[in-house]
């Protein structure tokens, strides 16, 4: 088990640092009778935790429907009351204003990418670093910095003695006597450096024994009341007892001004995210780095805040510390479940990026021109055109950037509700990275089955004006058959690895740091959707991401990491303009791996006008 005293770090690209209030103490008179095994061994799902009163979705919904919640539901009343209790401009009062040089302006016009090339050399030479050589003591310090030391949590469980709270804390206190391999596996780590600078090779020769069971996600209040459970078959009593154990563990560490981060037992890892008045935790046996689970928990928390703002949430628990939040969130379980499903394999969540629709740049520019708003809309924040679940283009005010995680929440909300795609909707929604304290309003209208317009405004009375403007935009999009051409581009968005034309290349993920966007081919054999091979490869990508971003407490981030197993070989190459993750056959030579990386980088450079949204207009 690992705990921390310093604050959590926020999502990548986010300037917000959320302060964690002190965790209230909790009586633990019975806590010495609770075993930590109950928390670690609860891996077999049995029954879904759902609110006691669930209303079915009406077949015909008015334009002001909230998600898939019925009219008059607690979630609808909560949003409506919060939105109506404050004037619309107040949403902007607390919002962050970004200057032109801000890193969070994700859709800026940027200079062309530099032509980086990886020198392959021979098989007997190491992969080169892009840094200059270091001599003497500096060279030795660099070598030392490249060693990744991973320590697992093992050892025997100690019985509690004396004070029950102290006993339970000692029961699950971390032991650092066991030497684990890279990423938390039990096999012996075999590593050799590929150069004397910032490159590292990790050879994993034993078979992967991970079972890759479905991850289990839980949300509870700081009073121990269940809020959400991801799997479908646990009994309500089992979930309540499990969350009581988790709340007791968290509370014990909080009494010492400490915070519980994660527990490791065998192949299982339990990661915690404390966002008072909510606690979130996840159980996984995939072997991923700890920050991956915490980031997924962060997204679950943000999705909850999109329905109940942080101000409303704190006010509710200040009035009643044992408030039942599940009633307020009634009808939103599909959005949390869909978010969890997407975050398992979608790398844009891990990298806090977007993957726009792949299309001709001229068609994208024509679409953006039709969406330029008139000057009379003073409180208009964002204008989006969505096709096939992907962004075609997005327009924003010059002084307000849009954070990728806020877009993820919006896209997930729309994708999770068929009502939002079939009915003209005026949706109150909180964008936590824009302003966690208030709501904005999104006008959503799908003009075709898979093509929708979204206008986000701070004015809660702007529905009729935006509705009239939508008709004007639609008329422009229908000129020159722009709308039909967008619809025709949807089935052309996915592409296969053969498009690159590189023998031995199985898969890749390319992140443009300049555009804060990614591109990747579809998952193909042997990495079909939901397969063990796909889960293993995704976990390997997560470990590579951890290495180049130093997310697990490494002394510094690496630039080039190569992992070879009996199944595949993977390479990550991090430069200033991009990050590239490639997967190749394990039989390929090092020079062939280097050549494949260069080929992918050149292919993306040639195709970036189609695969990236480069010229996002501002107004």
Curated annotation (Swiss-Prot):
Where are stretches of biased composition, namely Low complexity?
73-90
Query: Among the record's GO biological process terms, what is one?
Result: autophagy
Per the record, the major location class is membrane
Taken from the UniProt entry, a GO cellular component term is: multivesicular body membrane
Compositionally biased tracts (Basic and acidic residues): 93-102, 135-145
Q: Where is this region: Disordered?
A: 1-145
Q: Which UniProt keywords apply?
A: Autophagy, Endosome, Membrane, Protein transport, Transport, Vacuole
- Disulfide pairings: none
InterPro entries, sorted: FUZ/MON1/HPS1_longin_1, FUZ/MON1/HPS1_longin_2, FUZ/MON1/HPS1_longin_3, Mon1
Keyword Transport carried by entry: yes
Indicate, by first and last residue, each region the UniProt record lists as having compositional bias (Polar residues).
1-33, 41-58, 123-132
The residue stretches assigned to a coiled coil in this entry are none
Recorded topology in the membrane: Peripheral membrane protein
Q: Where in the cell is it found?
A: Endosome, Multivesicular body membrane; Prevacuolar compartment membrane; Vacuole membrane
Q: Does the keyword Transmembrane helix apply?
A: no
Q: Which family does the record assign?
A: Belongs to the MON1/SAND family.
Q: What does this protein do?
A: In complex with CCZ1, is required for multiple vacuole delivery pathways including the cytoplasm to vacuole transport (Cvt), autophagy, pexophagy and endocytosis. The MON1-CCZ1 complex acts at the fusion of vesicles with the vacuole, through its regulation of the SNARE complex during the coordinated priming and docking stages of fusion, and particularly at the stage of tethering/docking.
What is this protein's name? Vacuolar fusion protein MON1
Protein's organism: Cryptococcus neoformans var. neoformans serotype D (strain JEC21 / ATCC MYA-565)
